[in-house]
């Protein structure tokens, strides 16, 4: 229920000690080997050079090609696998120690944990410390408690981001050539010839990762104190106050870029003159006050549970960034060591949310169930007139297996019909989205001398009419159980419609200039679908086993966009009646393989061109949707759905005596991802699928000819089926319970092997099908495959 996060609240109870139990101590630890998961298979240096010659004749002479084949001149004609150069196998170890216990009145639990993880990319890693301590006590009608937790993370990376725009993986995937060595025999890093690249893209990825550093220390502390009283039979009151503090300190140092040399030691690019230190601090304090009144009572066959509550959340954060350049030495990383171009900026924001809520549960004879929820939430992110909103929900259930007429069906264990309807709110936008915001500028001229003055300028358009987003949900479900619930199944149908979606849309007929468009409640989206679960568990002798399966389908549909029919963003489009982020491009209908294909005409008998140019053999053939005889941007349309047709998972588990085995499999079906690669001028790596490209001797190739910019256009040709089934987790263990352990104060010892992402079944080549963005290429940090060995001991 509720308005927070993604339209709801999840109630979490952390581990606590048990009453009337002796002190228990447990330790768990593991060692993990991490390896890169699915990564592209790029062509070697020789085949890359052949392809380069096809688009740029004479780039590599016959003598050069021979050297690439025999490896006789690795300085000038290398065969470098850049993924192997920047990725590695890495280790991780984790340790967790907990102590718990209690008596009739007091319970406690304390735990500490430590982990150290090396990244699979050079100079990356994470070190983490954490602790948790919970204690609660009861005195007559009163209860008191204290929860404390905290952690410290230290993340290290190179100064250049490992992935994303401008990151190392982007260089490897798009710009770095296999014919360039990582390092010359003279000790200098291999130089990427920049004749067709900007200076920014001429970087050697391994060299870039070796320069500078970036460290991020993140601290978090949580504390909560609570007290309660039993007022009378079934009526309780509890109050609590929680405080959370976050601190993030990041230091990033970029040294002067070194001179770049060729294999003969000649300078090809002079050394940079600027080094830079940039520090970033973020601190956030959040407090939460909550008061709950509950009543729980059983009257004969009637069960009543009532909750009334009030909560207030307040948060304030501060951000500061400072930078400076001109360090006389590369060994000083403090701001005071810089000499030129100092700069600093910062800001702070605050936010509050107040909620009044209630819930009534009623059950009759374990057959008829009813629940009613209501929330009244107010957010500082909304303008005063629309600050508060009310969100009700109601649900009912009928346990028909408890009806008298079902008693004769002995193998029918459970039958339950559930229905629910409700509204939830969402206010996850900026803290001041409804107001006009101001920004500083130093470019105002107020005198004839031309001196610039500092001032403030409006940066956004206000809208004091915005209100909460609202999601209306309808659920209908059927739960069934058979053979003493050894077989259980659930089928659920749902319809979720989100209205008044807050979007920033341009205002028709109004020129905003540099102003940000205002937020408006203009969107509506529906997600409708179903989910089916079935589980089977049983035992025989020393054997125990379980099987579970889940299958779901969701249809996403845009219903409204503030009067707009569509908005286009690159290779995706939002259009009424279609899913969010639908693929947008040309519809590929084949390839020009013969001279007859080149004479393809439209309905008027006109030979179809591509952007006014006659196509060539080996080009991708596109549909002329507007039938004008020329393939242009006007012929683009929706070519695919970014959402899967269905998602599924299943788990298999079994145990025999002291051995246990569990597996979890997960997959999706009917999903497509872009696997586009630029092939116009061949600036960087290409995958091995290009070995089967069109040529006069290979007219039935799967890939087009190299060198045509139209082939690089986003089209259905580059949409590949990315359905997959993956073994997400596997664990095999053995538990020692010998009597001799008890004499040493040990109750049990378990050793196990665990793995993740061990197997993947997919038709997609070279890219990880689980990558969730619209473009499937691995220019981001790859998923990892892990192998873990662990130990659990309980005293």
Region roles according to the model:
Residues 72-100, 104, 255, 266-367, ...:
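Outer-membrane beta-barrel transmembrane domain signature of Gram-negative proteins
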Residues 8-9, 16-123, 158-162, 182-195, ...:
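Residues embedded in well-ordered regular secondary structure
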Residues 46-77, 165-207, 252-275, 316-344, ...:
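Surface-exposed loop/turn segments flanking beta-strands in extracellular/periplasmic regions
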Residues 119-132, 138, 147-159, 218-220, ...:
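Small-side-chain secondary-structure face that scaffolds active or pore-lining regions
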Residues 26-74, 520, 539-642, 763:
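Conserved small-residue
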């Amino acid at each position: 229920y509720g308005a927070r996060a993604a339209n709801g609240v999840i109630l979490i109870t952390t581990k606590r000690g048990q009453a009337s139990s002796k002190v228990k101590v447990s330790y768990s630890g593991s060692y993990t080997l991490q390896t890169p998961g699915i990564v592209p298979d790029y062509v070697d240096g020789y085949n890359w050079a052949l392809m380069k010659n096809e688009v740029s004749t004479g780039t590599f002479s016959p003598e050069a090609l021979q050297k690439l084949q025999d490896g006789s001149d690795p300085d000038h004609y290398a065969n470098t696998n850049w993924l192997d150069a920047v990725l590695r196998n890495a280790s991780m170890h984790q340790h967790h120690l907990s102590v718990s216990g209690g008596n009739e009145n007091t319970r406690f639990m304390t735990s500490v944990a430590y982990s150290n993880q090396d990244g699979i990319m050079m100079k990356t890693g994470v070190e983490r410390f954490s602790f948790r301590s919970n204690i609660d006590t009861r005195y007559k009608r009163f209860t008191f408690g204290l929860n404390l937790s905290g952690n410290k993370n230290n993340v290290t990376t190179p100064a250049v981001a490992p992935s994303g725009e401008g990151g190392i993986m982007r260089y490897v995937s798009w710009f770095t050539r296999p014919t360039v060595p990582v390092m010359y025999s003279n000790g200098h890093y291999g130089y990427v010839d920049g004749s067709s690249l900007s200076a920014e893209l001429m970087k050697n990825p391994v060299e870039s990762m070796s320069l500078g550093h970036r460290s991020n220390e993140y601290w978090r502390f949580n504390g909560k104190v609570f007290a309660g009283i039993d007022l009378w039979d079934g009526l309780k009151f509890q109050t609590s106050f929680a405080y959370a503090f976050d601190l993030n300190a990041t230091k990033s140092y970029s040294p002067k870029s070194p001179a770049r040399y060729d294999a003969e030691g000649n300078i090809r690019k002079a050394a940079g003159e600027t080094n830079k230190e940039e520090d970033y601090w973020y601190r956030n304090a959040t407090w939460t006050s909550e008061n709950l009144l509950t009543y729980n009572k059983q009257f004969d066959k009637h069960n009543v549970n009532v909750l009334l509550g009030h909560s207030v959340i307040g948060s304030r954060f501060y951000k500061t960034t400072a930078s400076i350049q001109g360090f006389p030495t590369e060994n000083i990383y403090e701001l005071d060591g810089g000499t030129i171009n100092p700069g600093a900026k910062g800001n702070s924001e605050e936010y509050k949310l107040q909620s009044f809520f209630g819930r009534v549960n009623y059950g009759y004879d374990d057959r008829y169930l009813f629940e009613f929820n209501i929330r009244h939430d107010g957010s500082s992110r909304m303008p005063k007139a629309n600050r508060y909103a009310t969100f009700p929900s109601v649900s009912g259930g009928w346990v028909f297996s408890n009806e008298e007429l079902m008693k004769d069906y002995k193998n029918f264990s459970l039958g339950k019909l559930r229905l629910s309807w409700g509204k939830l709110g969402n206010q996850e936008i900026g803290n001041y989205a409804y107001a006009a915001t101001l920004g500083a500028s130093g470019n105002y001229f107020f005198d004839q001398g031309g001196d610039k003055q500092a001032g403030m300028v409006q940066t956004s358009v206000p809208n004091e009419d915005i209100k909460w987003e609202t999601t209306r949900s309808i659920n209908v479900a059927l739960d069934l159980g058979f053979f003493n619930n050894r077989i259980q199944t659930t089928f659920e149908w749902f319809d979720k419609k989100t209205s008044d979606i807050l979007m920033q849309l341009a205002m028709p007929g109004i020129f905003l200039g540099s102003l940000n468009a205002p937020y408006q409640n203009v969107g509506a989206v529906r997600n409708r679908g179903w989910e089916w679960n079935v589980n089977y568990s049983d035992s025989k002798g020393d054997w125990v086993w379980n099987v579970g399966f889940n299958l779901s389908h969701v249809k996403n549909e845009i219903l409204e966009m503030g009067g707009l029919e569509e908005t286009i963003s690159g290779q995706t489009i939002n259009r009424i009646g279609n899913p969010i982020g639908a693929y947008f491009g040309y519809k590929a209908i084949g390839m020009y393989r013969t001279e007859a294909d080149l004479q393809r005409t439209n309905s008027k008998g006109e030979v179809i061109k591509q952007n006014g140019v006659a196509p060539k053999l080996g080009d991708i053939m596109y549909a002329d949707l507007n039938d004008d005889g020329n393939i242009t941007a006007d012929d683009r349309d929706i070519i695919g759905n970014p959402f899967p047709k269905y998602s599924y998972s299943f788990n298999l588990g079994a145990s025999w005596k002291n051995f246990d085995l569990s597996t979890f499999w997960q997959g999706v079906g009917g999903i497509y991802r872009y696997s586009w690669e630029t092939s116009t001028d061949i600036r960087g790596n290409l995958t091995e699928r290009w070995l089967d490209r069109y040529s006069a001797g290979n007219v039935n190739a799967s890939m087009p000819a190299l060198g045509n910019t139209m082939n690089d256009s986003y089209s259905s040709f580059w949409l590949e089926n990315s359905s997959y089934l993956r073994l997400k987790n596997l664990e095999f263990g053995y538990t020692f319970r010998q009597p001799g352990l008890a004499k040493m104060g040990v109750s049990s010892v378990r050793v196990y092997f665990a793995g993740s992402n061990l197997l993947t079944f997919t038709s997609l080549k070279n890219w990880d099908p689980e990558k969730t963005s619209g473009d499937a290429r691995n220019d981001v940090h790859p998923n990892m495959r892990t192998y873990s060995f662990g130990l659990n001991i309980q005293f």
